[in-house]
Each structure stands twice: as structure tokens, then as C-alpha cells.
């Protein structure tokens, strides 16, 4: 069952789909320096063996940094994933961060389960004008 929405401050952008946040309304043991995985999308990994996917991973991380640019965020649909990680919809300025990454072609849809194939992002990038 998801928890109620919570205001948060991003401490660090780990990669395109993981943030470290502080949630001031939570006790420090639960609310400081908490890794949050974005719900609804998956970005390439920074250590992917394919240099083209690594470049997309860096672009996704930089995109998230620019979109956030020290703005407060809201966490929605907060829950735990299969590895007990916190997974949430992250909204900044009223926009869903996962949706923005998907629209930018820097992420693929992901609802858990088997790791998605990020190579489709390469096809989309080369097909773009």
C-alpha cells in the first residue's frame, strides 16, 4: 500500500532513475539521505558495457539534474520494490519526472520485473531528425 505524498529535497542525483532525498517530515533515521528509485521508467546504467548506452546514461543523469536544479520535489505513490528499495513517482513543478525522461527518449517504461532492453533507445536516437 503506497504512503501519502511527501515533500522532499534532492540531495544528489545518482543516475537517471535514482535520487538521494531528504524528507523533512519523516524521522531522520527514515527520512535523511534516502535512495528513491523513480517509478515507471528505467534509464541505462552508467556502467553499461556499451559505450553508446553509457553516454545515454550520462545524458539521463544530466537531464534529471537540469530539470531538478535545486527545486523541491514531491514523492507520490511511495512504496517498496522487490529489493525493498523505495520506489515513488517524483514530481517537480507539477510534472512527473519519469514521464519527462520517457518523452526525452532517455528512458524506457518499466514496471518492475525483468530488466528492460535499453537498446531500443539507441534505435530511437538514430531515427530522430
Tell what function each PLM region has.
Residues 1-129:
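Small beta-barrel nucleic-acid-binding modules, primarily SNase/OB-fold domains
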Amino acid at each position: 500500500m503506497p504512503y501519502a505524498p511527501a515533500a522532499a529535497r534532492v540531495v544528489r542525483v545518482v543516475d537517471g532513475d535514482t535520487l538521494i532525498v531528504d524528507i523533512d517530515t519523516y524521522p531522520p533515521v527514515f527520512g535523511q539521505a534516502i535512495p528513491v528509485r523513480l517509478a515507471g521508467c528505467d534509464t541505462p546504467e552508467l556502467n553499461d558495457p556499451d559505450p553508446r548506452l553509457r553516454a545515454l546514461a550520462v545524458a539521463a543523469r544530466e537531464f534529471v539534474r537540469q530539470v531538478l536544479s535545486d527545486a523541491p520535489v514531491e514523492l507520490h505513490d511511495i512504496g517498496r520494490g522487490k529489493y525493498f528499495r523505495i520506489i515513488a513517482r517524483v514530481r517537480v513543478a507539477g510534472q512527473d519526472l519519469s514521464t519527462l525522461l520517457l518523452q526525452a527518449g532517455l528512458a524506457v517504461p518499466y514496471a518492475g520485473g525483468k530488466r528492460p532492453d535499453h537498446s531500443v533507445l539507441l534505435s530511437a536516437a538514430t531515427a530522430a531528425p
